[in-house]
């Protein structure tokens, strides 16, 4: 590697193609002649996190039309999306990449048998939120998901599925008051709590070097909220699954999208 990932990010060269070039051929067989979780890889990923590549390309599933009404984003079925599906499929099928539908794929990274992983930030504190016996003891770096191409304006980051949502009982006699209270709490937390999470927890506890702090600023600055992911069940889960399934299976995204479109629109 001529430049480190940090340098590539700062020089606007951290693109999907560069990332793929780095990881796709790094592989060492454990000795049984078959690709498995016991081998060494350039990159590993828990399959649900494949969604991050769609977001990183600046694509959302649901947007708004000129009237402000919700509609399927044209990017969701556009050329960039179709190309991204193809690129990710090729990456997933390369020798140096291993993916599975289990979070146990993290073990490969924790055991220092993978160069890179795409995952939630909390994994640096342990295998998962309930068990820190495999806390990372080696030096690591954190960078945003790679851009689709260098002409993309910024690095984009999707939010993981664990998030909190609040609801107000439809029978409440104080819906307006409850709504105002929730809005005020959310606004205050955004201004006072969220910055502390980044400045104290992430930039200190979840960083192994000073440059990681710069990366967290880029990651936070590019956070993308896609209503199609947040309310996926409303859209038959297609807005959350179409990209990932086509990328893993190598099936035609255009065909799958055409079949799912009536369900999404309904």
Descriptions of predicted regions:
Residues 93, 131-204:
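Extracytoplasmic/periplasmic substrate-recognition and gating elements
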Residues 46-48, 118-124:
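Beta->alpha turn/N-cap motifs
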Residues 16, 20-25, 54-55, 61-102:
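Glycine-centered hinge/linker elements that transmit conformational signals in sensory
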Residues 1-7, 45-68, 160-169:
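Periplasmic solute-binding protein
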Residues 20-25, 103-117:
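Short helices/loops that flank or line small-molecule/ion binding pockets
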């Amino acid at each position: 590697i001529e430049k480190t990932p940090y340098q590539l990010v700062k020089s606007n060269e951290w693109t999907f193609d560069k990332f793929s070039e780095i990881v796709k051929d790094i592989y060492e067989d454990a000795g049984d002649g078959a690709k498995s979780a016991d081998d060494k890889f350039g990159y590993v990923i828990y399959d649900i996190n494949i969604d991050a590549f769609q977001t990183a390309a600046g694509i959302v599933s649901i947007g708004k039309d000129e009237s402000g009404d919700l509609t399927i984003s044209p990017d969701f079925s556009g050329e960039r999306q179709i190309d991204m599906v193809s690129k990710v499929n090729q990456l997933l099928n390369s020798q140096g990449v291993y993916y599975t539908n289990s979070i146990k794929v993290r073990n490969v990274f924790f055991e220092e048998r993978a160069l890179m992983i795409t995952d939630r930030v909390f994994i640096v504190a342990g295998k998962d939120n309930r068990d820190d016996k495999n806390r990372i003891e080696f030096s690591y770096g954190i960078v945003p998901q790679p851009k689709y191409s260098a002409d993309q304006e910024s690095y984009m980051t999707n939010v993981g599925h664990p998030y909190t949502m609040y609801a107000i009982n439809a029978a409440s006699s104080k819906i307006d008051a409850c709504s105002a209270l929730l809005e005020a709490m959310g606004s205050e937390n955004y201004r006072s709590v969220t910055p502390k999470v980044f400045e104290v927890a992430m930039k200190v506890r979840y960083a192994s070097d000073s440059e990681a702090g710069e990366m967290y600023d880029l990651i936070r600055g590019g956070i993308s909220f896609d209503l199609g992911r947040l309310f996926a069940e409303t859209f038959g889960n297609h807005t959350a699954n179409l990209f990932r399934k086509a990328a893993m299976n190598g099936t035609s995204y255009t065909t799958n999208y055409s079949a799912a479109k009536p369900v999404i629109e309904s």
